Amino acid sequence: MRIGSMVFFALCVITGPTFAQNTENDAGKGHDLATLVCANCHVAAADQRFTPILNPPAPSFESIAQRPDTTAQSLEKFMTTTHRGIDNPGGMPNPYLMDYQVKQITAYILSLRK
């Protein structure tokens, strides 16, 4: 039992910084991807180079991040589901992102929380 606890502790110490780096790295990649893919309709970043084509724009990523019901799971589900249809022709289309891209944009949005 004692050896198992020591191994678990060692793994936590070793993988903790790696997990933090991956999250930061994903957020950085998510920022870059969001300014390419999402900024056409959303204010995805303060440093994006153009104004969204929607008037008014879709919710900003910063405002989405501040919502109390925003979680990694809710963002990932939203980004992989179409919200357009006969009853909602103006809804957000499914951007058809790869799983890793969804995780990167999710990490970026969550990094905007204050």
Label each PLM-derived region with a short phrase.
Residues I105-R113:
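Short, low-complexity, Pro/Ser/Thr/Gly-rich segments in the mature regions of secreted, periplasmic
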Residues M1-G4:
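Positively charged n-region of N-terminal signal peptides that target proteins for export
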